From Swiss-Prot:
GO molecular function, one term: rRNA (adenine-N6,N6-)-dimethyltransferase activity
EC supergroup of this enzyme: transferase
Annotated SUPFAM superfamilies: S-adenosyl-L-methionine-dependent methyltransferases
Residues holding S-adenosyl-L-methionine: 53, 74, 97
Statement: the UniProt record of this protein carries the keyword Mitochondrion: no
Coiled-coil residue spans: none
Name of the protein: Uncharacterized methyltransferase BLi02856/BL02021
Keyword S-adenosyl-L-methionine appears in the UniProt entry: yes
Protein species of origin: Bacillus licheniformis (strain ATCC 14580 / DSM 13 / JCM 2505 / CCUG 7422 / NBRC 12200 / NCIMB 9375 / NCTC 10341 / NRRL NRS-1264 / Gibson 46)
Length: 213
């Protein structure tokens, strides 16, 4: 369920916010236009939002500032502690992951995530989307920002470029986690009765908006 990556995020928690502002050259392109990406997710969201992979709370903060009701789900204790320290007292962050999580205190009209869905295998992604489809009403939305590739050739080219640039940590990340292609994401969502559209933000990250049919 992506929880195998918790040790990575326990170690990354204290430096994550430095990474997203571009201080780690290996991930500078991954996080280019980070604020704009999060703002795009917020602008596509409804009023009652369930967020997965809260991390240090950057997207959560923007959702709350926009007046949304938000329940956040985050499996890493270290990340939750940082998020809770920076967010308003009324912020609700619970332990859980994309598939195993407590019911939120409201019926969400939007489910969001940023930089996290790739922790799930494609089979787990479909399992998660199936569950979300049961939670959302007609026209309910899933809005995810994450690294996605046009095709497997584009993925291979990204790994090759990372290695040529000496970005070995980035290359290992790409080869270890479960980064999908656009067609794979289309299949996952349409098979669970969602329409889906993609907006590219940088060489890695796209914002995906799926609506329940």
């Amino acid at each position: 369920m992506g929880r195998e990556f918790i040790p990575l995020f326990e170690n990354w928690a204290n430096s994550y916010d430095d990474t997203v502002v571009g201080r780690d050259l290996q991930y500078k392109e991954v996080f280019r236009d980070y604020d704009g990406i999060l703002d795009d997710v917020v602008s596509r969201s409804g009023h009652k939002v369930l967020e997965f992979g809260v991390g240090t709370g950057n997207l959560t903060a923007k959702l709350l500032a926009a007046g949304k009701a938000v329940t956040g789900v985050e499996p890493s204790k270290a990340m939750r502690e940082i998020a809770e320290a920076k967010l308003p007292e009324n912020a609700v962050i619970v332990d859980g992951d994309f598939i195993d999580f407590p019911d939120p205190p409201f019926s969400p009209d939007t489910i969001v995530s940023s930089y996290a869905f790739h922790h799930l295998t494609n089979e787990e992604k479909r399992e998660a989307v199936k569950r979300y489809g049961k939670m959302l009403g007609k026209h309910g939305k899933i809005v995810f920002a994450d690294t996605v590739f046009k095709n497997r050739e584009a993925f291979s080219a990204a790994v090759k470029k990372a290695k040529e640039n000496g970005f070995l940590q980035l290359a290992e990340d790409l080869e270890t986690e479960h980064y999908p292609t656009i067609s794979e994401m289309e299949t996952i969502f349409t098979s669970e009765h969602f329409s889906i559209a993609f907006q590219k933000h940088n060489d890695f990250v796209w914002v995906m908006e799926a609506a329940k049919l």
